[in-house]
Amino acid sequence: MEREVIGFLAHTKNIKKILSYGLNPKRSEKMKKIKRNGVLVVISSPSGTGKTTICKKLIANDKNLYLSISVTTRKKRDKEADGIDYFFKSKTDFLKLKSEKRFIENAIVFDNYYGTLKNQVMDKLENGIDVIIDIDWQGTRQINDFMKGNVVKIFLLPPSLGELINRLSSRGSESLKEIDFRMSKAIKEIKHFDEYDYVLINSDVDEVFKKINKIIY
């Protein structure tokens, strides 16, 4: 595992830091300090790394785990359903929600607006339900500030940039230009890995699933 990380992030000055994630027992103390209403877990990764698949697998495995549904202005893709995958809104409706301070976080990603409704998250936490939010590093910063640090942050990495290109290409939903843009953005996103509590390489969905379960529970 260490060899994989070094190969992927050879340019990084914080190799020792990333290798310590998930290995340092002191990090589990953060979970114990969080007030046990519900635990808020943020999972971030570059597009195509598999976080959506892993989040759905976590939810299917635990009825007391809720996957927050984001509001977005982007167009609905084939097989996506409103209220299940996202709450699809017009730009006007989104900005109205923002002006009413209804979001716990919001950001512009690939020229589209995304946001997480405050009541959707807080109501669940107050009722003892653990919540997972699938967002980027921008949203993670906002949520961390709002929750005063009472959030567990997990960042997923692909096995390699080459594998990430293959995953994006196999989806068949992006043009070559869009894939190139996403790859450029992925490299920028990866630079924020050290803002997270845990960094995991997603070379095997089942293995990452097990590791995240250990982190949460």
Regions inferred by a protein language model and the residue ranges of each:
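Hydrophobic anchor at the beta1->P-loop junction of P-loop NTPases
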Residues: 43
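ATP-dependent small-molecule kinase phosphotransfer cores
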Residues: 72-131, 137-138
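Conserved phosphate-donor/acceptor-positioning beta-strand/loop module used by diverse small-molecule
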Residues: 131-136, 147-169
